[in-house]
């Protein structure tokens, strides 16, 4: 079987971290004997420069036909038109592909716990995933308005929107340590009451998964004081936005964190959570690990290459433990040097 992969290098450091990652993918495919077809398209700010839009119809159609999308990074101060920003392309892409679930792993190995801003004995052994609902909730609720003396936002969820994200989280927990924490604000919000009810209903289909309901304020505290207690966390859009950013600092650098966006079926999108960092673009300083770990997610979730994903993650973590890192992690290696060392593992 041959997989179709679309590469979207994007802006800033995106092209340099993605190009090295694609070279790695080629070596990995040769070792693990799978085939893929690769297409690359301009996306984000660079697409605005070339075509006047962050997402062309050609790029969108290519993404719709793909098994997986690898995205570098988008955005930057160059593109200031509020009606035509690079980020609009990503929002349209997510909506067009119905990517309603955002998956963010947070992992801290023993040898990397010193990088965290938290105490080593607190973070060592952290291995959690936050599953955030991405396309509903208060960010998309209607009515919504701002007037001179008042403003309104609407928080609405349907049972179908809740169930589909909850099932993704249950399936993920079932493959991991079988612990699911559902985060809500059930003591105040009506939508959270429905959320908790749906979680309890779906739980009947996953008898082996232990479910714990937690209020969002308590979860935000426990993420910092006892992150190792969590396996899979599932929550709605606003809460997930905040909690996933909170969790992303636990490993010690935004440059370490991968992410994936899932729909019910079809194309999935993989990208590091960091921005385009235009201040260091083309300076060979960017931390590539978030992008490389996003490739590992892609190998596991879209290309059915679990062994390859495990090996790639192990190599990255061994580099971090031995201080083969870029400057943001206290190392002295340049981006190109990290990729050279990574590729040597497959030669």
UniProtKB/Swiss-Prot annotation:
Cofactor: Mg(2+); Mn(2+)
Reactions catalysed according to its record: (2R,3S)-3-isopropylmalate + NAD(+) = 4-methyl-2-oxopentanoate + CO2 + NADH
GO cellular component, one term: cytosol
Keyword annotations: Amino-acid biosynthesis, Branched-chain amino acid biosynthesis, Cytoplasm, Leucine biosynthesis, Magnesium, Manganese, Metal-binding, NAD, Oxidoreductase
Location of the protein in the cell: Cytoplasm
Gene3D superfamilies: Isopropylmalate Dehydrogenase (3.40.718.10)
Pathway: Amino-acid biosynthesis; L-leucine biosynthesis; L-leucine from 3-methyl-2-oxobutanoate: step 3/4
Taxonomy, superkingdom: Bacteria
EC number(s) given by UniProt: 1.1.1.85
Molecular function terms from GO: 3-isopropylmalate dehydrogenase activity; magnesium ion binding; NAD binding
Residues holding NAD(+): 76-87, 275-287
Pfam families tied to this protein: Iso_dh
GO terms (BP aspect): L-leucine biosynthetic process
Cofactor note: Binds 1 Mg(2+) or Mn(2+) ion per subunit.
Residues the record marks as site: Important for catalysis: 139, 185
Assembly information from the UniProt record: Homodimer.
Family that this chain belongs to: Belongs to the isocitrate and isopropylmalate dehydrogenases family. LeuB type 1 subfamily.
Function: Catalyzes the oxidation of 3-carboxy-2-hydroxy-4-methylpentanoate (3-isopropylmalate) to 3-carboxy-4-methyl-2-oxopentanoate. The product decarboxylates to 4-methyl-2 oxopentanoate.
NCBIfam families associated with the record: leuB
Name of the molecule in the record: 3-isopropylmalate dehydrogenase
Organism the protein comes from: Staphylococcus epidermidis (strain ATCC 35984 / DSM 28319 / BCRC 17069 / CCUG 31568 / BM 3577 / RP62A)
């Amino acid at each position: 079987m041959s997989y179709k992969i679309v590469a979207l290098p994007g802006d800033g450091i995106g092209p340099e971290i993605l190009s090295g990652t694609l070279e790695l993918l080629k070596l990995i495919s040769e070792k693990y004997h799978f085939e893929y077809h690769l297409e690359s398209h301009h996306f984000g700010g660079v697409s605005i420069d070339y075509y006047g839009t962050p997402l062309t119809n050609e790029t969108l159609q290519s993404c719709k036909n793909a098994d997986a999308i690898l995205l570098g990074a988008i955005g930057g101060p160059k593109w200031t038109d509020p009606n035509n920003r690079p980020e609009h392309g990503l929002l349209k892409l997510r909506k067009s592909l119905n990517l309603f679930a955002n998956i963010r792993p947070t992992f801290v190995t023993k040898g990397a716990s010193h990088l965290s801003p938290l105490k080593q004995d607190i973070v060592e052994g952290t291995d959690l995933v936050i599953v955030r609902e991405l396309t509903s909730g208060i960010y998309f609720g209607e009515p919504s308005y701002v007037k001179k003396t008042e403003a309104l936002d609407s928080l609405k969820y349907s049972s179908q929107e809740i169930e589909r994200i909850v099932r993704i989280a249950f399936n993920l927990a079932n493959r991991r340590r079988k612990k699911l924490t559902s985060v809500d604000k059930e003591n105040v919000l009506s939508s959270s009451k429905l959320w908790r009810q749906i979680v309890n209903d779906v739980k009947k289909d996953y008898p082996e998964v232990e479910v714990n309901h937690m209020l969002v304020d308590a979860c935000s505290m426990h993420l910092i004081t006892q992150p190792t207690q969590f396996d899979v966390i599932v929550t709605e859009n606003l809460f997930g936005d905040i909690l996933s950013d909170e969790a992303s600092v636990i490993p010690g650098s935004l440059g370490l964190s991968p992410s994936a966006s899932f729909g019910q079926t079809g194309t999935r999108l993989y990208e590091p959570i960091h921005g385009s960092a235009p201040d260091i673009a083309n300076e060979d300083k960017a931390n590539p690990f978030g992008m490389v770990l996003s490739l590992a997610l892609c190998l596991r979730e879209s290309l059915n290459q679990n062994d390859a994903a495990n090996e790639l993650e192990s190599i990255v973590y061994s580099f971090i433990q031995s201080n083969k890192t870029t400057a943001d992690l206290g190392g002295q290696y340049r981006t190109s040097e990290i990729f050279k060392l990574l590729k040597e593992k497959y030669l």
